[in-house]
């Protein structure tokens, strides 16, 4: 039976370290500040924003929330970002996605100052990530890499298979693994014989957003499985992208859903905000 990689425990440890660092900065008169911008009334987005606010409060980071109506124009949102870019109290800016259809998401993300890009989505930061000199790393992939390190998983020389090619998780985590000298295969909806690709992996990172799409029988004996997916099945049940019980029979280590990668995402957002404040 696989060892469970406990995201809650790892996140709690890192948040403890962040709290100490924030206190150290505060003693020098600097309080890290995060601006969170929510446009509209999307229920999931509202939950995420309140979780981020609470997390900031818990570690001593100042958070400023901007709730804008769903019919906010792109020009008005860009004006707010411009204001936040020049606000010395704000070290990190987070735009809660998705944005309403009248707003060009790429244009908005590009308007954020790269030095305040706490989510790590600005093209400048993506480019730096690709060449191995990141300023900020996207929070979920960063969380995955920290979990692998904390679990004692050495990536150099290993076969890593990433399933899912999103700009938010799949692509950045593939580049991060490459920087750790892994041999990386990036799979997606057009990949032929996905089962065979997954079956050769020493480490599987699933980030496709399809409930239990990765079958336990595909997992190589002794592989490490990181499940980024969070999918609601029915009213209450949450499952990942991997068939957990069957995969846990074959893997050496696996992340659960919930309680795996999820807690790490907000933790790395806090870390990025702290780092931004340190650089000022």
Swiss-Prot record:
InterPro entries found in the cross-reference section: Aminoacid_DH-like_N_sf, NAD(P)-bd_dom_sf, THF_DH/CycHdrlase, THF_DH/CycHdrlase_cat_dom, THF_DH/CycHdrlase_CS, THF_DH/CycHdrlase_NAD-bd_dom
Annotated protein name in UniProt: Bifunctional protein FolD
The protein's role, per its UniProt record: Catalyzes the oxidation of 5,10-methylenetetrahydrofolate to 5,10-methenyltetrahydrofolate and then the hydrolysis of 5,10-methenyltetrahydrofolate to 10-formyltetrahydrofolate.
Gene (name only): folD
Record keyword Cell membrane present: no
Entry EC no(s): 1.5.1.5, 3.5.4.9
Listed Pfam families: THF_DHG_CYH, THF_DHG_CYH_C
Keyword entries, A-Z: Amino-acid biosynthesis, Histidine biosynthesis, Hydrolase, Methionine biosynthesis, Multifunctional enzyme, NADP, One-carbon metabolism, Oxidoreductase, Purine biosynthesis
Associated pathway: One-carbon metabolism; tetrahydrofolate interconversion
Subunit structure, as described in the record: Homodimer.
Binding residue positions for NADP(+): 164-166, 189, 230
Reactions catalysed: (6R)-5,10-methylene-5,6,7,8-tetrahydrofolate + NADP(+) = (6R)-5,10-methenyltetrahydrofolate + NADPH; (6R)-5,10-methenyltetrahydrofolate + H2O = (6R)-10-formyltetrahydrofolate + H(+)
GO cellular component: cytosol
Cross-referenced SUPFAM superfamilies: Aminoacid dehydrogenase-like, N-terminal domain, NAD(P)-binding Rossmann-fold domains
GO terms of biological process kind: L-histidine biosynthetic process; methionine biosynthetic process; purine nucleotide biosynthetic process; tetrahydrofolate interconversion
A GO MF term: methylenetetrahydrofolate dehydrogenase (NADP+) activity
Family: Belongs to the tetrahydrofolate dehydrogenase/cyclohydrolase family.
């Amino acid at each position: 039976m696989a060892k469970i990689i406990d995201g809650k425990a790892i996140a709690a440890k890192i948040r403890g370290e962040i709290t100490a660092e924030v206190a150290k900065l505060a003693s020098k008169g600097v309080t890290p500040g995060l601006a969170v911008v929510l446009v509209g009334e999307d229920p999931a987005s509202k939950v995420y924003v309140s979780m981020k606010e609470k997390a900031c409060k818990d570690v001593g980071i100042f958070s400023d929330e901007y709730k804008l109506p769903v019919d906010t124009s792109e020009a008005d949102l860009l004006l707010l970002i411009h204001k936040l870019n020049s606000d010395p109290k704000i070290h990190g800016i987070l735009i809660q996605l998705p944005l309403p259809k009248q707003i060009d998401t790429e244009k908005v993300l590009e308007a954020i100052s790269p030095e305040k890009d706490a989510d790590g989505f600005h093209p400048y930061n993506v480019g730096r990530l690709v060449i191995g000199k990141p300023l900020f790393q996207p929070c979920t992939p960063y969380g995955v890499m920290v979990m692998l390190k904390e679990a004692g998983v050495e990536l150099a020389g290993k076969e890593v298979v990433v399933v899912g090619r999103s700009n938010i998780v799949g692509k950045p985590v593939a580049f991060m693994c490459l920087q750790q000298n892994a041999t990386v295969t990036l799979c997606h909806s057009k990949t032929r014989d996905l089962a065979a690709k997954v079956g050769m992996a020493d480490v599987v990172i699933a980030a496709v957003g399809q409930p239990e799409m990765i079958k336990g029988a595909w997992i190589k004996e002794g592989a490490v499985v990181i499940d980024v997916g969070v999918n609601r099945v029915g009213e209450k049940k949450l499952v990942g992208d991997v068939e957990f019980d069957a995969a846990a029979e074959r893997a050496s280590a696996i992340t659960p859903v919930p309680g795996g990668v999820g807690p790490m995402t907000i933790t790395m957002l806090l870390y990025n905000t702290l780092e931004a404040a340190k650089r000022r």
